[in-house]
Regions:
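Glycine-rich beta-alpha junction loops
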Residues: 23, 51-53, 85, 122-126, ...
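Short beta-strands and strand-loop turn motifs
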Residues: 16-19, 44-54, 80-89, 120, ...
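Short pre-catalytic strand/loop immediately N-terminal to key active-site residues, enriched for Gly-Thr
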Residues: 141-155
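Conserved phosphate/ATP/ADP-binding segment of small-molecule kinases
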Residues: 60-141
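Conserved N-terminal subdomain of the carbohydrate kinase-like
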Residues: 1-59
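Short, small-residue alpha-helix embedded
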Residues: 152-175, 179
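Charged C-terminal helix
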Residues: 176-197
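SAM-dependent methyltransferases
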Residues: 138-140, 152, 193-197
């Protein structure tokens, strides 16, 4: 890739690399190569494998795409799929009604893909709440944080969450504090949008 070759020649590096929606196998390959070229012991790679929701893949994607996305997640430090995306990448059955054991099993299977920290978004253990649950493979540590579920759905909330999470990490906060800030900020964005659509 001439762009990444130029970056290398100019000795350009990155404190963080964050990916969201990727539209093709080719784009995943380009990003995978970029990760290989620019990963350092000190930087952070976060992948939001945007491709599915509510038990279904988006129309442009199939199960082969989900498996390909799983190979990209393997190269990340942190991954932030929703439950649907995680079910397609791990082969676990998607459930609308679940318990903590199901979520922990799914996080374990996500961790097996290779990322240091796996996070599931849209996790709810109690009616009227929605939250995130993360798993730190190295320290065998889980973290759950929830907010009141707001009765609205907007495109881009996952992007806000992941972007805020990266921003918090870049400001020196640990992964748990970063998830909390990102969840709170996303909830506040939804709340303000509901007040003034």
């Amino acid at each position: 890739n001439p762009i990444t070759e130029h970056w290398k020649k100019e000795e350009i590096g990155f404190d963080a690399i964050y990916t969201g929606y990727l539209g093709s196998f080719e784009q995943i390959d380009i990003i995978a190569n970029l990760f290989d070229d620019f990963k350092t012991p000190d930087n952070i790679i976060l992948v939001d494998p945007v491709m599915a929701d509510n038990g279904k893949l988006y129309p442009a994607f199939d199960e082969a795409f989900a498996k390909k996305m799983a190979t990209l997640c393997a190269k990340a430090d942190i991954i932030v799929p929703n439950i649907t995306e995680a079910s397609f990448m791990t082969g676990m059955e998607y459930k609308e009604v679940y318990d903590e054991a199901y979520i922990k099993e799914m996080l374990g299977k996500l961790a097996e893909l290779g990322a240091k920290i796996s996070v599931l978004t849209g996790v709810s253990f109690k009616e009227g709440t929605t939250g995130v649950m993360g798993y730190d493979k190295e320290n065998d540590e889980y973290f759950y944080y929830s907010n009141e579920k707001l009765n609205a759905s907007y495109h881009g909330t996952g992007d806000i969450f992941a972007s805020t999470c990266v921003g918090a990490l870049m400001n020196g906060l640990d992964w748990k504090e970063s998830l909390k800030i990102a969840a709170d900020y996303t909830a506040e964005c939804i709340r303000l949008t509901m007040e003034d659509p």
